[in-house]
């Protein structure tokens, strides 16, 4: 076998090895991206007696093998609620400090000044406007809104 043939055989073998090795390599490698925060809409009574809103990112810390965890919140119970699509509740404060998580359906709350906050599936609301004028609650869309109330223990 001549030197040219040996060189072609060598190049062919190396090519085959690279193809086989590449076929078994992990191609799902992605560049690390920041994780999307868990966002809570907090409504609270301001010094003016009106309800205001802010977005809060939930602070998470490594939780061992179970992912990331927030601090444990002390709660007093849990309650489900179903509301008709056309529900309307005029100005009212929250009855207590509580999380309200929309599971299905849609609603919105309206604050003084006309600001509306949409409440869709997965939305987490922290209602702390227990004094003052409060907010308006209403249904949006054509299906019942199912939500979960999680009252917080007193601080």
Could you tell me what each predicted segment is?
Residues 92-109:
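Short, conserved beta-strand element in jelly-roll/cupin
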Residues 76, 114-116, 120-123, 129-155:
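Ligand-binding loop in jelly-roll beta-barrel domains
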Residues 25-82:
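A short, N-terminal "cap"/entry segment at the start of jelly-roll beta-barrel domains
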Residues 10-19:
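Bacterial N-terminal signal peptides
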Residues 88-89, 106-110, 124, 155:
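Short beta-strand segments in beta-sandwich/barrel cores
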Residues 1-10:
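Bacterial N-terminal signal peptides that target proteins for export
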Residues 57-61, 76-94, 129-132, 154:
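Conserved short histidine dyad/triad with adjacent acidic residue
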